Amino acid sequence: MISKIIKTCLIFFICLINVHCLASSITPDKLHAKVIKVVDGDTVYLKHKEFGKLKVRLADIDAPEKNQPYGSESTNILKGLIGQKIVELKKITVDRYKRIVGIIYYENTEINYYLVRKGYAWCYDRYNNRLKIKNAENLARQEKLGIWSSQGEAPIAPWNWRKKKGK
């Protein structure tokens, strides 16, 4: 009886280890996949031949929400850059919503950086640890690009917008 319990536990742990290895097999290496949907300015769906459909949140940045000023512009810029294209994904982690958080490259351009540098996303200070992204935001602000081009009120960061809207 005891050996049967031990055997069952051993099989369970072996299965658990295999599932963990499968889940982590796409990290930290890069993979190539097709963008099948741009959800908003910082979230896309990719289709990978081996791993299927992957929901990806762009690391280190936060783009305006869809119903926020510049939300549709940010989404459309991202669609224009990588919509239906084969991109390279460097997986950083998986967030609490089970999305892959990563850096996307297209034709040797880092898309995360590009969006911030052109003023279509904020550096997400809460999660960012790359000076390159913070510097990109500072340059976009100085040059009054995208979200920083308004002469009126300062733009509301997406994390404050979500808090204000109760999301």
Write out the residue ranges for each language-model feature.
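Small beta-barrel nucleic-acid-binding modules, primarily SNase/OB-fold domains
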Residues: 2-167
